[in-house]
Amino acid sequence: MTELDYQGTAEAASTSYSRNQTDLKPFPSAGSASSSIKTTEPVKDHRRRRSSSIISHVEPETFEDENDQQLLPNMNATWVDQRGAWIIHVVIIILLKLFYNLFPGVTTEWSWTLTNMTYVIGSYVMFHLIKGTPFDFNGGAYDNLTMWEQIDDETLYTPSRKFLISVPIALFLVSTHYAHYDLKLFSWNCFLTTFGAVVPKLPVTHRLRISIPGITGRAQIS
């Protein structure tokens, strides 16, 4: 093969390679990927409230969040069903009553009223105000639920839930009896027990959020 033939063959091969390159579809480059990312809408948290109004409702979890919730037992709520968990409520009430009896000048009527008030406020903060769990074992699947909503996997009318509803009602009746049915103390105990211990536990308020501007913040979302 002469030198001219070799050069001609090389030029033909180069021309064929250039044509093949122009016919190929370009592979997605970094620039095209970045442009597609820019046009993609941001992912919204499905657990955000449905509206920005004062009263809102927490939406159900996705399939992935439900799997995270069922991965391990929820230690933040399973203790409610343990042996002795019910007795501790009675012990706390007795200790509160003995504590307020130590204050001089506090009558029996007011000691029972203060006991009822302390128990109701404490249980409201514990079961209905604080959200999430102190344990990091489920990828934040419970971060938007209160302890009351976590108990028994949100199953209503379980024995534990019925007990937790009946305790403040029984304490209210005892406080009213030992307050000798004083109208002012009765009204105060009735209002506090109804809206602090009974209504938040009803099915109608399940996953319900009430946001008061300047007082309560947004629901916790991880």
From Swiss-Prot:
<dbReference type="GO" id="GO:0005789">
    <property type="term" value="C:endoplasmic reticulum membrane"/>
</dbReference>
<keyword id="KW-0254">Endocytosis</keyword>
<feature type="modified residue" description="Phosphoserine">
    <location>
        <position position="32"/>
    </location>
</feature>
<feature type="transmembrane region" description="Helical">
    <location>
        <begin position="110"/>
        <end position="130"/>
    </location>
</feature>
<feature type="transmembrane region" description="Helical">
    <location>
        <begin position="185"/>
        <end position="205"/>
    </location>
</feature>
<keyword id="KW-0472">Membrane</keyword>
<dbReference type="GO" id="GO:0030148">
    <property type="term" value="P:sphingolipid biosynthetic process"/>
</dbReference>
<comment type="similarity">
    <text>Belongs to the ORM family.</text>
</comment>
<dbReference type="GO" id="GO:0005783">
    <property type="term" value="C:endoplasmic reticulum"/>
</dbReference>
<feature type="compositionally biased region" description="Polar residues">
    <location>
        <begin position="12"/>
        <end position="23"/>
    </location>
</feature>
<dbReference type="GO" id="GO:0090156">
    <property type="term" value="P:intracellular sphingolipid homeostasis"/>
</dbReference>
<feature type="topological domain" description="Cytoplasmic">
    <location>
        <begin position="1"/>
        <end position="85"/>
    </location>
</feature>
<dbReference type="GO" id="GO:0006986">
    <property type="term" value="P:response to unfolded protein"/>
</dbReference>
<comment type="function">
    <text>Component of the SPOTS complex that acts as a negative regulator of sphingolipid synthesis. Acts by inhibiting serine palmitoyltransferases (LCB1 and LCB2) activity. Along with ORM2, plays a role in the phosphorylation of LAC1 and YPK1, the distribution of actin patches between mother and daughter cells, and in endocytosis. Disruption or inhibition of sphingolipid synthesis leads to the activation and phosphorylation of YPK1 through the TORC2 and PKH1 pathways, which in turn phosphorylates ORM1 and LAG1 to activate sphingolipid synthesis.</text>
</comment>
<feature type="topological domain" description="Cytoplasmic">
    <location>
        <begin position="206"/>
        <end position="222"/>
    </location>
</feature>
<feature type="topological domain" description="Extracellular">
    <location>
        <begin position="107"/>
        <end position="109"/>
    </location>
</feature>
<protein>
    <recommendedName>
        <fullName>Protein ORM1</fullName>
    </recommendedName>
</protein>
<feature type="modified residue" description="Phosphoserine">
    <location>
        <position position="29"/>
    </location>
</feature>
<feature type="region of interest" description="Disordered">
    <location>
        <begin position="1"/>
        <end position="57"/>
    </location>
</feature>
<feature type="topological domain" description="Cytoplasmic">
    <location>
        <begin position="131"/>
        <end position="162"/>
    </location>
</feature>
<dbReference type="Pfam" id="PF04061">
    <property type="entry name" value="ORMDL"/>
</dbReference>
<keyword id="KW-1133">Transmembrane helix</keyword>
<feature type="transmembrane region" description="Helical">
    <location>
        <begin position="86"/>
        <end position="106"/>
    </location>
</feature>
<feature type="modified residue" description="Phosphoserine">
    <location>
        <position position="56"/>
    </location>
</feature>
<keyword id="KW-0256">Endoplasmic reticulum</keyword>
<keyword id="KW-0443">Lipid metabolism</keyword>
<dbReference type="GO" id="GO:0090155">
    <property type="term" value="P:negative regulation of sphingolipid biosynthetic process"/>
</dbReference>
<feature type="transmembrane region" description="Helical">
    <location>
        <begin position="163"/>
        <end position="183"/>
    </location>
</feature>
<dbReference type="GO" id="GO:0006672">
    <property type="term" value="P:ceramide metabolic process"/>
</dbReference>
<dbReference type="InterPro" id="IPR007203">
    <property type="entry name" value="ORMDL"/>
</dbReference>
<comment type="subunit">
    <text>Component of the SPOTS complex, at least composed of LCB1/2 (LCB1 and/or LCB2), ORM1/2 (ORM1 and/or ORM2), SAC1 and TSC3.</text>
</comment>
<keyword id="KW-0746">Sphingolipid metabolism</keyword>
<dbReference type="GO" id="GO:0017059">
    <property type="term" value="C:serine palmitoyltransferase complex"/>
</dbReference>
<keyword id="KW-0597">Phosphoprotein</keyword>
<feature type="topological domain" description="Extracellular">
    <location>
        <position position="184"/>
    </location>
</feature>
<keyword id="KW-0812">Transmembrane</keyword>
